[in-house]
Regions:
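Thiolate-centered catalytic microenvironments shared by cysteine-dependent enzyme domains
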Residues: 1-82, 102, 160-177, 181-182
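Positively charged, proline/Ser/Thr-rich regional signature most characteristic
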Residues: 1-6, 75, 80-148, 188, ...
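Short, well-ordered beta-to-alpha junction loops that form the rim of enzyme active sites
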Residues: 14, 93-95, 155-156
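A secondary-structure boundary/capping signal
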Residues: 38, 120-121, 155, 179
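C-terminal appended segment following the main domain
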Residues: 138, 142-198
Length: 198
């Protein structure tokens, strides 16, 4: 069957888990809380010799009501306003070299949003799975993110940032948003600053 209000939904990816976490975030932000991600994705599932099907399946339409939680998404203006807001921590999920501006950035201008902290999405993972909760929490505590009331995560285009967002949600932070436009949008506006260095 399709997705109903009481359906348990599990997303998985045949590639990097960020594609599943992006789908998870979209449904989660639409008010559907019975949604999960298969840790390790299809690769781990296959490595464990679990059942697979080649059947495409046929499903009737579901009746899920969308109750969008607008607080789970922010735009360019809200992200810019957060730069000087001590109650909001902005985190960049890209690789350290991209964050600092030292590595090539195919989005355009190099650097990161002012006052944002670098929490590379890959540091949340271990062999394709999320790290244990205590390790995730340590990541966010050591970076100074954990005690902040609200967190905005961004990346290149709103995909890998959902790894950080899910990690925060898994350890109990309930006020996380994604800047959906991320660097793909930010770099195009020359009036918006970018900071280089770590």
């Amino acid at each position: 069957a399709g997705i109903d209000d009481d359906s348990q939904v599990v997303f998985y990816s045949s590639g990097h888990m960020m594609w599943a976490t992006r789908a998870w975030w979209m449904l989660y932000s639409c008010g559907h809380k019975q949604v999960a991600v298969l840790d390790g994705g299809l690769e781990k599932w296959k490595a464990e010799n679990r059942d697979l099907s080649m059947d495409a399946g046929s499903y009737t339409a579901g009746q899920m009501r969308v109750n969008l939680d607008a607080e789970r998404w922010v735009n360019k203006e809200q992200t810019a306003a957060a730069i000087e807001d001590g109650g909001i921590c902005t985190i960049n999920a890209l690789a350290p070299g991209v964050y600092s501006g030292e590595a090539d950035m195919h989005y355009g201008r190099r650097g990161h949003i002012e006052n944002s902290k670098n929490l590379y999405y890959d540091t949340m993972m271990n062999e394709g799975c999320f790290k244990p909760a205590e390790d995730l929490r340590q990541n966010f505590e050591e970076s100074g993110v954990w005690g902040t009331p609200r967190v905005i995560a961004y990346c290149g285009g709103g995909i890998s940032a959902t790894i950080d967002a899910m990690a925060l949600t898994l350890i109990g932070h309930d006020n996380v948003a994604i800047y959906d436009g991320s660097m793909s949008e930010w770099v195009k506006d020359e009036s918006l600053p970018l900071i280089t260095g770590s």
